[in-house]
Amino acid sequence: MLGAVGPGALWGFEREIMNLVPMVVEQTSRGERAYDIYSRLLKERIIFITGTVEDNMASLIVAQLVFLEAENPEKDISLYINSPGGVVTAGLSIYDTMQYIKPKVSTLCLGQAASMGALLLAGGEPGMRYALPNSRIMVHQPSGGFRGQATDIEIHAREILEIKRRLNEIYVKHTGKSLEEIESSMERDNFMVAEKAKDFGIVDKVIDKRGGEQI
């Protein structure tokens, strides 16, 4: 949660971080060209999901996915995830785009993939979902709060239960587990080491060295 940090402070912090992003200089036939490191990696079809999943970040991820599809619809895309989760609807916009576009999307967890981060990790192409050995994965049911009239509270309660049902169905689809197993596993915060996430069906392989995998 962001707590009492206002959007102005957050964007100021992000600007400071961007000032620290390394630049990569390449020689081309037209001379030198400088890229920030993330733009250079985007040329290699690598996208990073880092930090809280929210609308601004999700729109950038979706735009990158669609751009890479337009550039080459037959070439795989790699999604590197280090996220504590965030807003469900923002995460689902990324997930739906991953399923919608033509390129296969491989996923790799480095650091952590919690909440919506875990769902995006699980939503990668079957056989192409990876985790580094010391990464942590956490799944749970959605949470939220609402204040208002009793009828409005009831409406929002039905909505969060519908979201819970939809998320559970997504996990059933990508893990191969039954709905009952998923519901039981999501009842409380469920932390997993990489190997346990593999057994659960969120990832296909735990890797500690780069091999023949396209990631």
Curated annotation (Swiss-Prot):
Record-annotated active site: 115 (nucleophile), 140
> What GO terms in the biological process aspect are recorded for it?
protein quality control for misfolded or incompletely synthesized proteins
Q: What is its EC number?
A: 3.4.21.92
Xref: InterPro entries = ClpP, ClpP/crotonase-like_dom_sf, ClpP/TepA, ClpP_His_AS, ClpP_Ser_AS
| Compartment annotation | Cytoplasm
NCBIfam families xrefs: clpP (TIGR00493), PRK00277.1 (NF001368), PRK12553.1 (NF009205)
Role played = Cleaves peptides in various proteins in a process that requires ATP hydrolysis. Has a chymotrypsin-like activity. Plays a major role in the degradation of misfolded proteins.
Q: What is this protein called?
A: ATP-dependent Clp protease proteolytic subunit
- Native species of this protein? Anaplasma marginale (strain Florida)
The organism's taxonomy opens as:
Bacteria, Pseudomonadati, Pseudomonadota, Alphaproteobacteria, Rickettsiales
